[in-house]
Amino acid sequence: MKHAMVSGGTRGLGEAIVRALLEDGWVVSTFGRHSTAFVEATQAAGHLHFYQADTADPAAVERVIHAMVERAGVPFALINNAGMAREGVLASMPVADIDAVVSTNLSGALYVTRAVVRHMLLERAGGRIVNISSIIGHRGYSGLAVYAATKAALDGMTRALARELGPRSITVNSIAPGYLETEMTHGLSAAQRGQIVRRTPLGRLGRPADVIGVVRFLLSAEASFLTGQSILVDGGISC
């Protein structure tokens, strides 16, 4: 069985990705700040391993990645999914909120990728890295400047790493979802949801399954010549 690591795999889109990989026969390691009922129930089956860690802490990340490799072997796939958003115009956003978003969305992804790539390079077996970005990083949205900055940075990291790791047969791509039916959009008002749906050519919010299909493709042999790309899964809202 191939081993996949998923950051932020305990809820929302991350949980859906973990479920899909388990269905496909992967051994999955995931980590986050807190366990969930899904994690506790699924770990008992033996193919899901959960570790409690804050990805913004580089020392903790190194320890957790080492433990994962010791337990399940060097991963073939890494999905950087951990993320958070804090809304507010930049001029009045507290520094603590800025730091929290940057630490989780960008620094955490850098620390996790750095630790995992070291093992991939030593293994010399190629690999796949998928960064979960956002349409917010491609288009400007008022009140989300910090979140947009971190997601755009993930896309930049994707392109640079694709060049660094391509000679070692490790592909690096990002997926930029639009608005999805997850807990991150549950706080939207009916008016806000209606506005998003009206602006989306396909006439609905996205579903985790829409993203999972792209994840599965990027991890497959059919995607072995695809790297350095950001794939928008947004129902056409960016057209």
PLM regions with names:
Residues 89-90, 97-102, 185, 196:
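Substrate-binding pocket helix/loop in short-chain dehydrogenase/reductase
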Residues 113, 150, 158:
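Active-site helix of classical SDR
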Residues 118, 163-167, 224:
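Alpha-helical segment proximal to the catalytic Tyr-Lys
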Residues 91, 139-145, 167-168, 203, ...:
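Active-site loop immediately N-terminal to the catalytic Tyr-X3-Lys motif
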Residues 134:
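Residue(s) in the substrate-gating loop at a strand-loop-helix junction
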